């Protein structure tokens, strides 16, 4: 098919909110804070300890407010145009999709397969998609669930695309609907009932497998590799579940199961280690120029999500403006009034849009599209020629694998075509090589986790990796399609929320004292000053409670000591004079 005529209309637009009133209010508050600090400082010698504590706390609050105002100053209104992209081209670049799961108990396989099904059914040529599922728990139930889901996918995906179903996660599509829409055709109603029955059977099989693992999963057949293994002590397991051998656009995408090798004496580096294995395995199997990573509980809510991301990648005037595309994390079935703040609505609405107008949003660990060459450590405008990419350098930096070296060279070389970069061969023909790059000892002596890939050194590997990318000069894009691109489930109980927020606070604070901290990135890298301030705003989250608690107990302390920490007005002074 001949390429379509190029259109002069932009694939995306970024407008800025006219938030002049809110800016004025924020600056006025900042003026009041500075006035209070000046008064505190000038009168400090006339007061005691409580005055000094108030000065310290209020100085902290002023500093945080400066970071807040800076981050919210330029709020963006991004807009993408997938129809224009479809008019412009019919030959799209390939995308490798990464879905990560680690515990079949905390992350039930039924949730994982719904995420996978929603991603396999997106509006994008199937011969340009490959979905890799990383199972860090090496669970036979997870693998069995994916095998059964792949059978259901042969019915579900054609059904979604034929009838243009907008919600393509089965558990959400069928929830609350006991019968098909009455205003639909007779044919649709019959197919709807059949698909729902098939999905019920799929759910029952997975639930039975979860409670009766050995009986349901035939350990003597394709599941033999899972026998007598432990989640933290097993060899690499790679299974090609679905394969689009014919390379047809309206078929089913590749689906590959991966459980990387784990040994007790080898650090596995948690999710960052799993993501690096996915990057290498996909590099030797399909080598798509773009990669999407999604948590197993974040299903694709918008079937055109990849087209929205491609509007940025293919529409950017300069690659530096789009190192990665981040979709905000929204959630379904949250508690009314959101008492724990798990929905993060205010953060996305103001802070997310604000940093979108600086150097771009942070990498949030899910719902993010990456350029493969950026993950491989390439800096903006860095040009690598065939003569400048020595085989010895590739093996020392990326690992000793001929096939991986070839795919990396194809990705990094200047002028490489992103369409031709994709490996159209069958993934099953690279199983042995994939086992090699998925082994736990492959990274030793290389730059994985240090200068390329997902970085090690923090439990919030996503923020650290995104910070390192932006410190090299790359910008990121904030994409807000309607409906939301991805929806996930947030904790609904207090203890679970505290555990999650403790992990976030600890990990973000770790990054602040990392060798790749935002301050280092600004002083010695290409991280913009206001972007550094935005990173500081979130990374200092763990310290805020100290000053807030201290300030909160000052009134009680003053009552006990018969003192005061708030400035007295004229009325208070007049009242005191009258009393005396």
Annotate each predicted stretch with a short phrase.
Residues 501:
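Acidic, metal-coordinating helix/loop segments flanking the phosphotransfer/catalytic sites
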Residues 1-475, 487-488, 505-520, 524-526, ...:
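Glycosyltransferases that elongate glycans
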Residues 480-496:
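Active-site donor/metal-binding and catalytic loop motifs
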